[in-house]
Amino acid sequence: MTITTTTLTRAAGLSAVAAGVLFIGVQIKHPQLDADFVTTTEWTVRQSAKALMAVLSLVGITGMYLRQVRQTGVLGLLGYVVFGVGYLIIMSIELIAAVVLPAIVHSDPGYVMDVLAVATGGQAAGDIGLMQPLNLVAGFTYLGGGLLFGIALFRARVLARWAAALLAVGTLASAAIPLFPQINQRLFAIPTAVALIGLGYSLWREQRTRSTGTVAVTPLDPAGRK
């Protein structure tokens, strides 16, 4: 198998689609966040899936940006960098949640509950160290990066514009999460997830069309031609 830029870009598109599907999947029947849930296998599986979602999203937006560097300009670069940093931080937070929190929940349940409170837009009763600024920066970079990157993709007119607009609006709407109960907060993931699926499919299809269109066709000589 020959690895080409087209192959890599199509893979990035599929990564974005997978990220969107995972983002929706981890929200389905999500239990209430509390110390008891942290001790379960389901917690580890869900947090690991969220970390994988962040990695796939990063791969996906990287492919989207590289496909349209010139068209998105400075705004695209800024949006990609900020959004990418956001996903890197989200990945780190989810890995910490999957590995560290279950290990300390019995010895320091108060700390774990404070971390969970901050993760859902609430306030910590005690000191949670670097987890406080880490969650804060993750929130700002996710919201700001998604908005800027979505606008840049919309203006570039290369990928599906409806999905680009939905990415900008969906990520920005996440700022309202602290205003809703945990059960309703899960709904805010759907617009961004659908946007990733739409953009990823658009990137994959666009590369597939370009690849098919470059196949050279040599006309046959008419029968009996001398």
Positions of predicted regions on the chain:
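Hydrophobic, aromatic-enriched alpha-helical segments typical of multi-pass transmembrane helices
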Residues: 2-226
